[in-house]
């Protein structure tokens, strides 16, 4: 499971507000129930079970939000909260009509809990593509893929810049004097030695003194000098929660399917160096993966 970070709650106004209200409502219901149980002989027992159950649900939601795993455990959260809504509703129906003020205060606490549960079910039960969820997540400072919820799936560039792997600058232009014998012997592609009918057209003689293979620098390891060395260790394992198609213009990215298991060398950045079971290596967006 992902690491719990308090900043995921403190930096998310929606999470901070709903969790705070839920804790306050639970405290009101708990203290009022203690007083009502002392003053009343027929205080309903199921209200105590509702208090204990909602304590666990509130802790669970706090952990899920703090670890930013709402997409992973959203279905389970909705299921538990649905049962909690039934318990709090029954407690409200039983206590709100009591003549005791402490029982009515406990009912008020359960009403607040029920309202928060409804909001949570609507949030966690909605898909990431839902408009309201994307709007809520847009205010979060540390939400993974915060601006990606308006699309069919989270895009990897929605939460940060990845390392530059393609050139965006204009190509360097050289003159014939600067090249000094390194021009190609085929001015027109597909016609070795020049265009048809050109003077001294020959595919066997270099026209501009092309360097022979003996003059080229030797490469002992068989790799380009500009190629980034691949890591030798992949200590982490991650599971893909979405399918991803690599950018065809970027040879460093890799494609993978949903639920595929990848080996990861470093998890500190937004883009992870990963290796597939087939041995293919490359970079993968971290918001498409979850550590195992």
UniProtKB/Swiss-Prot annotation:
Domain SH3: 233-292
Primary localization: membrane
Cytoplasmic topology ranges: 1-14, 68-69, 126-292
Alphabetized SUPFAM superfamilies for the sequence: SH3-domain
Topology feature Extracellular, residues: 36-46, 91-104
GO cellular component: plasma membrane
Transmembrane domains' residue ranges: 15-35, 47-67, 70-90, 105-125
Alphabetized InterPro entries for the sequence: SH3-like_dom_sf (IPR036028), SH3_domain (IPR001452), Sho1_SH3 (IPR035522)
Topology within the bilayer: Multi-pass membrane protein
Entry keywords, A to Z: Cell membrane, Glycoprotein, Membrane, SH3 domain, Stress response, Transmembrane, Transmembrane helix
CDD domains, alphabetized: SH3_Sho1p
Biased composition (Low complexity): 209-222
Residues linked to a glycan: 100
Subcellular location: Cell membrane
Region (Disordered): 185-231
Protein task: Plasma membrane osmosensor that activates the high osmolarity glycerol (HOG) MAPK signaling pathway in response to high osmolarity.
Subunit relationships: Forms homooligomers.
Protein family membership: Belongs to the SHO1 family.
Protein name from the UniProt record: High osmolarity signaling protein sho1
Species, as recorded: Aspergillus clavatus (strain ATCC 1007 / CBS 513.65 / DSM 816 / NCTC 3887 / NRRL 1 / QM 1276 / 107)
